Amino acid sequence: MPPKGKGGKGAKGGAASGEAADKKAQTPKGGNAVKVRHILCEKHGKVMEAMEKLKSGVRFSEVATQYSEDKARQGGDLGWMTRGSMVGPFQDAAFALPVSTMDKPVYTDPPVKTKFGYHIIMVEGRK
């Protein structure tokens, strides 16, 4: 009989572990946070100039420093951003992008429009 009692406790613990495992299983798919960089321009013409620079092979951080109206000194690095901490269109785009590097960036094309202006977004990490 004692094994059943242990099994009962184990089952309860197992359910809790199962819930934690479910949360962990969901994390790699969409993640709850992204390490993001962006280039923000108020004017569409300026963001398209920045896009052309990126397409010609200029590093994302350099283009951000030259063109972005936000966080330019950090090369557009916003750090880790969690779900719910970003405006809707920015968040949707950030979580849809694959993780990429400065050497081979994958960014939003066309730029994403928010109340702040036009963003070119790239994601460097996901957790």
Swiss-Prot record:
EC numbers for this chain: 5.2.1.8
Annotated source species: Xenopus tropicalis (Western clawed frog)
Swiss-Prot/TrEMBL catalytic activity: [protein]-peptidylproline (omega=180) = [protein]-peptidylproline (omega=0)
Similarity annotation: Belongs to the PpiC/parvulin rotamase family. PIN4 subfamily.
Domain of life: Eukaryota
Residues of the signal peptide: none
Gene Ontology annotations for the cellular component aspect, listed alphabetically: cytoplasm; nucleolus; spindle
Enzyme kind, highest EC tier: isomerase
Keywords: Cytoplasm, Cytoskeleton, DNA-binding, Isomerase, Nucleus, Rotamase
Region of interest called Disordered, as start-end residue ranges on this chain: 1-33
GO molecular function: DNA binding; peptidyl-prolyl cis-trans isomerase activity
Full protein name: Peptidyl-prolyl cis-trans isomerase NIMA-interacting 4
PpiC domain ranges (all copies): 31-125
Protein's UniProt keywords contain Ribonucleoprotein: no
Record has Magnesium as a keyword: no
Annotated GO biological process: rRNA processing
Name of the encoding gene: pin4
Gene3D superfamilies per record: 3.10.50.40
Main location: nucleus
Subcellular location: Nucleus, Nucleolus; Cytoplasm, Cytoskeleton, Spindle; Cytoplasm
Physiological role: May be involved as a ribosomal RNA processing factor in ribosome biogenesis. Binds to DNA.
